[in-house]
């Protein structure tokens, strides 16, 4: 039977408590971020290089629009709550940020409304450079810049990407204490979790995302895939990359992973599990898989593994570490 969040919450709590009591080393060996921060503060404003290579200069922005929920949260963490005038729908749907009721919603993160953005007269817009789901953001660049609005692009997949964006945002707001409390301190806790919990036997793992239209497997380049890899798991898609495009239950049965992790996408978890049952679990051989037979077929919570966890990224690592060690003893 697929395990849920409640079944392992106690184990995670003990692990998190232990991690929070330890002063630790800086996070290392996690790869490079997806864009390079090159920033300089001067009397003429604050200048940095964004995710699409633009040299961006900002001058104490007072009207900021963010087109992703995770970016809105980062801006708020950086001390910019009072200057956030507009955001995307997922910010209020998926996150509890304590935003005022009258904040402007300028479309979804996939389909932002340029007219509504321009009507807010922003001096800075935070956009995503990821073209897989948010190519509409890149398409807004000319319109925004043509209106004299600074359009800054970011790419956040892994923790170090979050840390880079947070550093830029706290440089802009001048709130460097926030960079240390919601960035560096989290980095240190992650480093300790990895150091204390990495598995040496490299158990194999399958990571899946299920949604109303089907099922998609993920490799070690994804947010959760990277965390599993850092904790010592071997993602089966790293050896079978064709499964990224051609999801195959038969290949899963052939490889027989030690762990199967599932992330539900969308607003209906019941529908996600129904989709799993109809498209995966209905195979007669499914129940005989090592992961299923040993209760290592696990549903992961969306708040830690679908949405960017930002200032609680260490909780995502601790959650996985608790799962992996719970099954190992």
Give the positions of each predicted feature.
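Bacterial Sec-exported substrate-binding components of ABC uptake systems
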Residues: 2-17, 28-73, 176-207, 319-329
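Short helix-initiation/N-cap motifs at beta->coil->alpha
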Residues: 50-51, 104-115, 240-249
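Extracytoplasmic/secreted envelope proteins and their assembly/folding machinery
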Residues: 61-62, 68-73, 114, 118, ...
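A short, structured surface patch at a secondary-structure boundary
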Residues: 66-120, 124-134
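Short secondary-structure boundary segments
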Residues: 88, 129-130, 240, 263-267
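Alpha-helical, coiled-coil/dimerization segments enriched in small aliphatic residues
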Residues: 91-94, 216-245
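Extracytoplasmic ligand-binding site segments that recognize negatively charged/polar headgroups
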Residues: 93, 131-139, 154-168, 202-223
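Structured C-terminal subdomain patch of bacterial secreted/periplasmic proteins
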Residues: 161-174, 180, 262-329
